[in-house]
Amino acid sequence: RPVELVVVDNKSDKVEAANAVKRLTEHEKVLAIIGTYGSSLAMAGGEVAERAKVPVIGTSCTNPLVTQGKKYYFRACFIDPYQGAAAATYAYKNLGYKKAAVLTDVANDYAVGLSNFFKKSYKKIGGELVADMKYSSGDQDFTAQLTELISKKPDIVFMPAYFAEGAIIMKQARELGATFVLMGADAMDNPDTVKIAGKAAEGFMQTAFPYDMTMKDMNDQAKAFTEAWKKNFPNKDPNVNATLGYTCYDMIIDALKRAGKADREAVTKALAETKGLATPVGIMTLNANHDAEIPVGILKYENGKRIYLGEIVPE
């Protein structure tokens, strides 16, 4: 029996996200949903899915609250406490940076959460936090914050921004003569980051999901995904949500096979029991909170290209 894929656009809006899930559960009568990328969108749609008792797997919704107390919501990604701790560990232990600062979008739950987890972990392992700067979504001029950061002389600045905003920050930082290393998180993982930032992206680092086309040791599932992507989109590199969407599909098909029937409750139960599943982002096991236990990847930008450095396990 073939699998039918029904696509609905949530328009990156919380109200539309809830409406999209309602349409899929009530009108399309879907068995399961491959969920959204943003945590706020996932939480808005998740409430609808919970009431409808339809299993959902989010792609890159990393806020811990997404799955907290939810029976029907799962995710194919790690969560922000783990990612923030990994960034702090890499900055302090692997790079040897003893002084850090953060630059946070206070209007974004994702950014606020990640910054808090980074700060807590960085100080816990011995690092010194020299500045804690803020801005709001939509800001275009970061001169004041960057000037203050330059005066504090951090070794590294952690900024969990979305890629378009983060690229602007990179450009303005270099124009002001900043020499500190800039480090972002998974929301910066987009091929357009370099296109927007240009030469200012040189030396930028970020945490990422454990897949990239530059990986030296790609597993069989990652190879299969990459080959399929290149065949269908020869002029475009895959982004992280494409990889995780593919992973979510694998997880649903695996759960459906183990459930033995196309039943929402049976598939939900099988998803909760996901363990040791080979996927493009590694061996997938879901914990009791329905969160994926996968490593955190590290990317660096050199000579206009992304380089996958490997994985990090936080302290």
What is the predicted role of each segment?
Residues 17, 76-99, 112, 141-143, ...:
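Hydrophobic alpha-helical segments within soluble ligand-binding/sensing domains
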Residues 1-68, 76, 135-142, 164-167:
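Beta-alpha junction/loop-to-helix N-cap segments that form part of ligand/metal-binding clefts
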Residues 24-37, 57-59, 101-104, 153-163, ...:
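Periplasmic-binding protein-like
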Residues 73-137, 156, 234, 252:
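An alpha-beta-alpha
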Residues 229-243, 251-305:
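Segments of small-molecule ligand-sensing domains
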Residues 170-246, 257, 300-314:
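Extracellular/periplasmic periplasmic-binding protein-like sensory domains
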Residues 48-49, 114-209:
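Extracellular/periplasmic bilobed ligand-binding domains
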Residues 1-4, 27-32, 51-55, 69-72, ...:
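Loop/turn elements at helix/coil->beta-strand transitions in domains of secreted/extracellular proteins
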